[in-house]
């Protein structure tokens, strides 16, 4: 019988057991008690917002247990269209007439609700007769119509100490001892995500090593993808296979492609091969959900399926195993390069021709036809848009790209010569202007000198006259 995940085994059953979220829990209790007292709050939906692993989902189920509610859960990532979501949310409009228990409609990952369905869901919230609780990692990504109708309760990121204390309690209940440095390392890697930390702890303990320090040392050894594949395909031990992703410098979705490529080369029987492919298909589902929701703690489940699930699928070939790189990676790399070149051309068209993106995309189609049919005009477009050799090849194809590029270089050289010629002519004109300006400046200076001299002479004459008058008056008084 497979071991129960510790995340579920040790999930808090009561609100008081939730770690370091006292303010949030207090608001949630006040809100739900308003419903129980027959006085529903003005905002009939509650939005729990905070980082992954902070206790949002746990709060909903602990609340339901304490206040005797039935939880109807749906996930916005899986049920995105309004028609699908509405079937569940419609339950909020009526009481559960046949049963005694009231309902809580729990909408997880509300930040993934499609905007097109948000207005109708908002209407259903307005007329709800049962409480609706939503959870989201990113508050501002929840559609505005829903944010406006929901009371916000913020969950804070757990500290490293909070995470370590929770792990210690689990180890005590399991009767297991793990060195403190191991717990510190796990808490650091979790970044406040308690769910991820508990999954990591269970993985470390399940490694089967008496000394957990060995597992940490194993993390520090850099492995190639071929060594990681060896752990998956050369072992029938699920616990050992799960170590394959430790410290591998590759994301799980990339490693999945390598495993997928090598399954046919490793398994002997079709039914065993089918079991291996079933395991990686489940892993792919978890990876897809992690990508859509940003809840990367789901990677743990994906890694378990793609490593341990594949390892125990059947009998592998014995002896030397040659591993093959996935063709998918090559195709994705090529298509990525093409997309990058295409986007670069579109940006240049938008900039040089002052177009919107949609107009630029349509214009690029016309330009591509020109590049295939009229090489001379294509060369002029190359210069005008400032296209690179790779971009010319994208538009014209390899066969014509060389010719167009050569013509474009010739045009650029010609333009450069013209620019130099114009630059020289302008310099000559500037020199002539300077020479013409100098004589005028000298004449102007002489004129100013003459005027200054005249003014001085006039001043001196006035002084002399004044002096003459003063002498005459003095002489007159003396007489």
Curated annotation (Swiss-Prot):
Residues 420-479 are annotated as: Disordered. One of its GO terms (molecular function) is ATP binding. GO terms for biological process: DNA replication. The lineage of its organism: Archaea, Methanobacteriati, Methanobacteriota, Thermococci, Thermococcales. Residues 420-468 have a biased composition (Basic and acidic residues). PANTHER family: CHROMOSOME TRANSMISSION FIDELITY FACTOR 18 (PTHR23389), REPLICATION FACTOR C SUBUNIT 1 (PTHR23389:SF6). The keyword Nucleotide-binding applies. Keywords: ATP-binding, DNA replication, Nucleotide-binding. The keyword RNA-binding does not apply. Belongs to the activator 1 small subunits family. RfcL subfamily. Part of the RFC clamp loader complex which loads the PCNA sliding clamp onto DNA. The complex possesses DNA-independent ATPase activity. ATP binds at residues 50-57. This is Replication factor C large subunit.
